[in-house]
From Swiss-Prot:
Keywords: Aminoacyl-tRNA synthetase, ATP-binding, Cytoplasm, Ligase, Metal-binding, Nucleotide-binding, Protein biosynthesis, RNA-binding, tRNA-binding, Zinc. Catalyzes the attachment of threonine to tRNA(Thr) in a two-step reaction: L-threonine is first activated by ATP to form Thr-AMP and then transferred to the acceptor end of tRNA(Thr). Also edits incorrectly charged L-seryl-tRNA(Thr). Its main location: cytoplasm. GO terms for cellular component: cytoplasm. Residues 185-478 are annotated as: Catalytic. The lineage of its organism: Bacteria, Pseudomonadati, Spirochaetota, Spirochaetia, Spirochaetales. This is Threonine--tRNA ligase. It comes from the Bacteria.
Amino acid sequence: MSKDLDKEDVLYKKRHSIAHVMAEAVRDLFPNTKIAIGPPIKDGFYYDFEFKKQITEDSLLDIENRMREILKTGSSFEKELISVEQALEIFKDEPYKIDLIKNFDLQNEISIYKSHNFIDLCRGPHVDNMNKIDPKAFKLTSIAGAYWRGNEKNTMLTRIYGTLWNNEKELRSYLNLREEIKKRDHRKLGKELDLFSIHEEIGPGLVFFHPNGAKIRALIEDFWREEHSKNGYDILFTPHIGKSWLWQTSGHLDFYKDSMFEKMEMDKSDYYLKPMNCPFHIAIYNTGKHSYRDLPFRWAELGTVYRYEKIGALHGIMRARGFTQDDAHIICTHSQVLDEIKEVLRFAIYMWSKFGFNSLKAYLSTKPDKFVGNDSDWEMSLKVLEEALSGFEVPYEIDKGGGAFYGPKIDLKIVDSLEREWQMSTIQFDFNLPERFNMTYTAEDGKEKRPFMIHRALLGSIERFFGILIEHYGGAFPLWLSPIQAVIIPVNNAVEDYAIKVFNKFKNEGMRIKLDNTSSRMNAKIREYQAKKIPYMFIIGEREAKEEKISIRTRTNEQINGLELDEALKLILLKIRDKEI
């Protein structure tokens, strides 16, 4: 369950309750339907069904109307505790409920909820009665496929999604936001703006960057490398595959194998595509001996990794099988840890601001029940993370017990223009890999000690970050990131020589600029380039040619007439240099 959901929250209870109402409505309209599960989720609810005959979204309105009829009864939601034997009898015609019940302890009682003419296997909680739900405050939004228990080997069920709010005004506000999200979907804009494609026949989850998208990606990566070099990082390059002993030693084959691609056999050895970069960076560290005087090492890599994501989990470039991780590892001594964490936080905040993200949230994850390392290292590292966070104006919450077994961490989330949170940066202590790979350094007292290792990502994966940027800006990238920054449009052939002069002047200064001297009508050209979200159109008429000026039309339809050519160049280059948003 998303940690954004609080079971005691009234909206959570309403959404849980309306899911039961939906299941009853579906059963009334489609009597032979088998019912699976239906929880509340962030922004709404869903329920999974096995229909005898597949339904379409045309059926959603009928289901909504039946739901409103049920709500009018004002029926109560009543909890009852029963034995496993009773549950098996009640749900004997519901195979998915039976599958769940068989996993329960026979000695324990099972919780069910009754409402109107419906009984469901459920822990709750729910509202007291249906009068608490505004019948105008919900809507069924979509239909999707979902495997039972998320396993591709199981039956494909039909999942009906819905949303519910406290009142109709909140619902309308959410639906308007949802429409805007659809318009900005990175998969839709990726095709319209010719940024990337995914070819199922070649391989699901594998991203092809087209020239426009590749240009933006290159700009992001160039900026990343430049800033990392400025901030004391050394850039690494490591292979894409490694022998099985490496992944055995790291623990990936024990704990992460289901997310790895199958092994490849070559030269009497087994190789795996790398799911992470960490063991390769450690291999570089272990090529020599190190003194405390050498530390800290700050090693960063844009390393392509491969993870076997289930088909149903893939989502454009946001969730892919091959992607480039913005990875870094800081290897340091005990006394250096606090300064290094503070510096990573400062760096993360700076990087996000350059891409237009100034609203951040942080989550500090503490020690889980099962962990490696000693208590003193955990306590020290948690104090360091908390002290580092307290020095920045970033609100944070404690995620008690949410740390990985190998160390505590800070997760940084950004908030986009559609008010959605995205988990991006991670700062993670690791007490596991230094032990597994026997990483050491010679301390000041001459003894061999274990260094502290901090995993750190700022952008996450380049592909996912690119997808977030597309949706955040609706495809209208900032000037410095736009694949084409301006188009020159001469109004007729008589001014073409001057248009070429303007083109060469801007191009020679490094601008990504295009000259359109085709015979199409000017208004059609302007509409085309605004649709392509190109920041500037330079309109060259006879007056501009005579006075050596340009008139600028922006993608948002603003107009600046008669700007001196050199002044325009100076202003635009300044915006690009400063990475103005």
